[in-house]
Swiss-Prot record:
InterPro entries: cDENN_dom (IPR001194), dDENN_dom (IPR005112), DEN5A/B (IPR047278), DENN_C (IPR043153), PLAT/LH2_dom (IPR001024), PLAT/LH2_dom_sf (IPR036392), PLAT_RAB6IP1 (IPR047277), RUN1_DENND5B (IPR047293). PROSITE patterns: DENN, PLAT, RUN. It comes from Danio rerio (Zebrafish). This is DENN domain-containing protein 5B. Residues 973-1081 form the PLAT domain.
Amino acid sequence: MSATMSGSGSAPCRFAHYFIVCGLDDETGLEPDALAALYQWLEADRQGKDPEATAAGENFDQSPLKRTFKSKVLAHYPENIECNPFDQDAVNMLCMPKGLSFRTQRDSLAPHFHSFLITREDGSRTYGFVHTFYEEVTSPQICSAMQTLHQMHQAEHNTSAQNCTSSSSSSSSSSSSSSMDSLSSSLDDVDSPSAHGGRRTCEGYDSIRDTLYVSKAMCLIAPMPFMHACKRFLAQMHRAVSCSPPPPLPLESYIYNVLYEVPLPASGRSLKFHGVYEPILCQRPGVGELPLADFPLADAFRLLGVENLVQLFTCVLLEMQILLYSQDYQRLMVVAEGITTLLFPFQWQHVYVPILPASLLHFLDAPVPYLMGLQSKEGTDRSKLELPQEANLCFVDIDNHCIELPEDFPQFPNRSEFIQELSEVLLSFGQSPEGGSSSPEPAVMSLQTSVLEKELKSTSLRELVDDKTNGNLGGEALDVLELLQGNPTLERLQALAKRTGVKVARLEALAAGQKGDEGVGGRSPVEEEELRNAKLNVQLREVFAARFATMFADYESFVIQNSPDLESWLTNREQMHNFDKASFLSDQPEPYLPFLSHFIETQMFATFIDNKIMSQWEEKEPLLRVFDGRIEKARLYNVRAPSLRSSVYQKCTFLKESAQAIEQRLRKIDHTAIHPHLLDMKIGQGKYQQGFFPKLQADVLASGPTSNKWSNRTCSTQRRVERHRQQNEHLVLDNELKEKYMQEARNLGKNLRQPKLSDLSPAVIAQTNWKFVEGLLKECKMKTKRMLVEKMGREAVELGHGEANITGLEENTLIASLCDLLERIWSHGLQVKQGKSALWSHLLHYQAREEKNEQQLESPVSNGQERRKTESSVGLPGLRVSVIQDMRHIQNMAEIKTDVGRARAWIRLSLEKKLLSQHLKQLLSNQALTKKLYKRYAFLRCEEEKEQFLFHLLSLNAVDYFCFTSVFTTIMIPYRAVIIPIKKLSNAMTTSNPWLCVSGELGDSGILQITKNILEMTFDCQNLGKLTTVQLGHDNSGLLAKWLVDCVMVRNEITGHTYKFPCGRWLGKGVDDGSLERVLIGEFVVPCGDDEGGRGSKTPPLQRSPSQIRRISITSLTGKGNKPTTVQIQESIGEAVNNIIKHFHKPEKERGSLTVLLCGEGGLVWALEQFFHHGFRSARIFQKNVFVWDFFERIVAFMENRDQTGDLQESPEPLSLNSESLCRYVNAINNMPRNIGKDGKFQLLVCLGARDRLLPQWLPLLAESPVITRMYEENALLRDKLTVSSLLGVLETLHDFPITLETSLTKSVEL
């Protein structure tokens, strides 16, 4: 109890919370690892056996020296601390992730260091630092047990060798294996004799001949990651145990000192405390500096190289699944901690396990973003490592210095300049940016040098013991090595050094009466190295931080803060938009967009914005406070000289300043902790045998001092600040609401669970998986809702109900995110891993079964899974709707090389066809296949959640996507075209030779000749994108050349998208306007749902688009008496011009077809045609139809006639130029070889006039010409000067925009 109480008060401000010893418990003896048994239980469950009946039996195939045995926490001090309860299972598992390791004198017995962290459920972290060494086994029972196990292994080995020949033929029958089996076997392959080239076969264990050693670990648990300080303290502790003579004080004194008398350094301060032999320094950054990060980034850059590390950094920012792979636990930790500290001001929000214990391999099955580290074994081949899911995985092979990236990976902005700046920082510290080299280990000393070192150490210790110095050492000046000065053995040691040719700088310096181990400013070489690492660390981090400060310099302007108080914000958190993403993206340089559009969708960015909003009512989150301070400082000093929209790279300006702050702290130590001293121990206590870590005196280590002025003062201050902050929080919100919403708001996304290491029962694992299932369903709901809102928002914009935004980029990001989610769902609980894409693998299994069934049936009738789109009334044959048919389309695309790419293409195609939910429902309807492929806990085997998931996907049928057509722009696509004549009024067929040319946003098909008397044709051509126009014509040959066409229908045979091109006009000489060729403007036919709700399987009736009326001659229009009013005509022109202006205000990739806005229904040509027709005189003169084009021709004839008689020369100069251009354009159109008819010619003139900015110049010529009086009534709009003047102003607004015309409109015109 006293331990708990003593720990609770001062623990938050203590340097270390616990000292722990883990290893072999002699009393319980050798125990198989319980977690390995749990793993067997899980595998038995997966294979459908009774897990309870599975014997835990011994694995005699494996050498006992290589088996996993249970380690135990042998001692930990203090017993418990209230603010950081001791988690025995987690600590034991992470101190010895593989359990106990046994070795003999033939093996390497070198100690090694690693660190770990434990993430608690609230997201807070505790750090552990472990020094593992080997201790001789003295227990006869343990040695005897190991001998017995070895003999059983030998017997098993001999038996299996005899049976090897007979079993080899049958062993190949089973081809499929569990992905987790493969993973564990690939990790264990190296334990087999062959993996080591037979190293172990003849080197067993003989208790008489061999000395047996077992691993033991010393561990410090600390609240902050002071890695270097803890590493040095533990190394000195081990030296004290392994070397002779013992240190001047009992080990308990040093442990007590570090646990209870060494405080945490305050912010912006440095601390010095004493280990067994040398002082240890550490320092903590100030409030305005980057937070503490003591893991050496230099090592991470050295291992991976700058380029790979930047790619890994980008993957982490985009919250992909990251798996680090290395033999060395510390390397895993260094890379994981290094990469997460570089995220400032953002924080990783998902599963974070830098060291994944072997018993937790099933956690790689998690269908969520994660950052995990997996230990490899020497000689393991990466190709054997089969992971449950790889579609969105970034695999980092640290030891081989390489990285495997996911597909569709956007690059970090200004990547090459960024890499260059980082390389310059590394080179300034003498480190190569290339990487690919291991951490530089200290050079191995020769035998003579180590002898000298030992003599040196023993001499210094003897002097220290003789000095009878207990309690605090005699001040700062008392350095252990100084005691050697004037020592009689010094000359002997120097003479020995000279004879052996070994140069020891320290001895020479001591002989000269100096401190030989001190470098610049009185620091030892170790301290110099630590200072260098700290300066390099902070400079590299500053470069990363500066990139974010530049990219998000104005982020605050786009934060949406519309809640009056914290309570209402928390209550409505999920329904609110907190950040104006579209406006933010539109403000960014174009090259940044692919990365930023993905990044602002991540959980870490959402949490960052949440923290910003909550800072209105609460104390600012520390990282946010530092980042905002940086931005404010940059504004104050006007560092950001280039504009925000510029993509000019700006280098970091804080490098020297940040390095100086660290150097100053280490040059002038702010606080020196109390020195280790004798404790209240009896005489004889504290003695121990050399080479063996002793059983410590628990009573003296159980609790700290009752009065420690420094810690009490500091802690009372900290407690007061903490209490004040909590009171403020409680004033804002009552406890109940806070409990309900606060965790959710602050930890959105964090609820996708850290693995809890302390409880790994099957029930807990099942519960964790169930939470994953719930998380996936919630994510699906949020993603589909977001896609619908974005898409509907865009359609509202197109209807004039909003503002144009960057939507296509966002849409593509959201679809890519949906593809990633589906891959994660299909990877969850996977039984058999085949290929990198779990979804595509499932589809291939389904395809194989269905095709086999089809062959067995041998029937041409399509089965229930395949249906045709219902035959439409206009002659388009039904389109086959089938999962397998769409798969075949993807399989025929040579451009896609990988399974992940094929799966994504299939998802995009199904989404575009509005069949995604239906297809996946069909795929999962084969329950036998699903059971074969997936474990019981898999998402796809949870019936209720699966149904909800499919329902959410079904909601996407409410909107139109072109996500397949717009992405795969180079593929060949089959199209089907049908010409539909008006049979009642003309011949269904024509004797002439018809042709058509289909054009789209990406190109055109070229002229396609249609077989006579055939109204339907299919053709293949490169993806045309969304279709815009069809040119339809014939050569006017034969007796029945006149042809009245209602419309042309064109369908993309892969996506099923159908376009209708209304005509309603004659093609033929001497009828209508005499056109032999018409340019038809297309409209997308929205598919109708059938009885299953949004299936989209039949072509709709033609009246689906009522706005498109048939284009008819002016004469028939006037005869019907449906003349538009003058106001309607003026409004239609204004609206047509406004739509064109809106078109150009959209981002270039989002603009769509300008041809529709010019020539389509309600377009500029249509509106001007209404204008020119208003007040047109009697329709029939000499029984001939009169068209607007006739008016233009007469104007031109009149001008040319006046020019010939000389009258035109008296006109003003500008009028002469305008007249000349009008004549030139009209004559060019009349002289072209195409027979496009008079209405077609008028359309072309308007388009050319708009393109070349000539319409406002021509309009006054038409209005002032004498010809107008003969062809227009007095009340005609064209004769109203005010109307003409206002129309000029409207048309002139188009001069600011570069109008380009499709070749289908301008073909053959020579100007």
